[in-house]
Regions:
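Short, extreme N-terminal segment that most often corresponds to the first beta-strand
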Residues: 1-25, 32
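Sparse, context-dependent recognition of short Cys/His-centered cofactor- or disulfide-binding micro-motifs
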Residues: 5, 9, 48, 74, ...
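Short low-complexity stretches enriched in small and charged residues
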Residues: 16-22, 47, 72-74
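A broad, low-specificity signal for short, low-complexity segments enriched in glycine/proline
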Residues: 23-30, 50-52, 68
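Short secondary-structure junctions
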Residues: 25-40, 88-89, 113-117
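An N-terminal amphipathic alpha-helical segment
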Residues: 36-61
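Charged interaction segments
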Residues: 53-124
C-alpha cells in the first residue's frame, strides 16, 4: 500500500498571490494568504491544511501545501497550478521520473513538459 504524501510543493513563475489563492480555494476551502514577516512568507492555515507561499530561486515562488489535500504528487499539483495560472511551473519529478538527480525538475508550461537542470546559481 502506498503511503499518502503529507506535503506537495511546486515553484510558480508568478507573483500573483490572489491568483494562487484562487487556484487553490476550490480544493482547500477559501484560501486567504496573509503575510508572516517572521517567516518572510504568505501563509494560510485551516484545521486540515497549511499553505506557505515564499520567494524562491530566480523569479519563482514556492507554493507548499502541508496536510490533507487532493493531489497525489508534486507533479499533479504543479499541473493544476500551471493550468489554472497559465504560467510556467516547476516541481520535483520523482513521482514519474525516479531516476533523476537532485537538480532535475519537471518544467510545465502551456506548450510542453520537460525535464530541466535547475539550481540556485542558474538564471531563468
Amino acid at each position: 500500500m502506498t503511503q499518502r504524501k503529507t506535503d506537495v510543493e511546486a515553484y510558480v513563475l508568478s507573483r500573483d498571490l490572489q491568483g494562487i489563492a484562487s487556484a487553490l480555494s476550490p480544493f482547500l476551502g477559501c484560501v486567504q494568504l496573509e503575510l508572516d514577516p517572521e517567516m518572510q512568507a504568505h501563509i494560510w492555515l485551516s484545521d486540515q491544511v497549511r499553505v506557505i507561499v515564499q520567494d524562491s530561486a530566480d523569479c519563482f515562488v514556492s507554493v507548499w501545501v502541508i496536510g490533507q489535500f487532493p493531489w497525489s504528487s508534486d507533479i499533479e499539483f504543479a499541473r493544476l497550478l500551471a493550468s489554472q495560472l497559465q504560467c510556467t511551473v516547476r516541481c520535483d519529478p520523482n513521482a514519474e521520473h525516479p531516476q533523476t538527480g537532485p537538480c532535475t525538475f519537471l518544467e510545465i508550461s502551456a506548450a510542453q513538459e520537460q525535464l530541466i537542470e535547475w539550481s540556485e546559481d542558474q538564471a531563468v
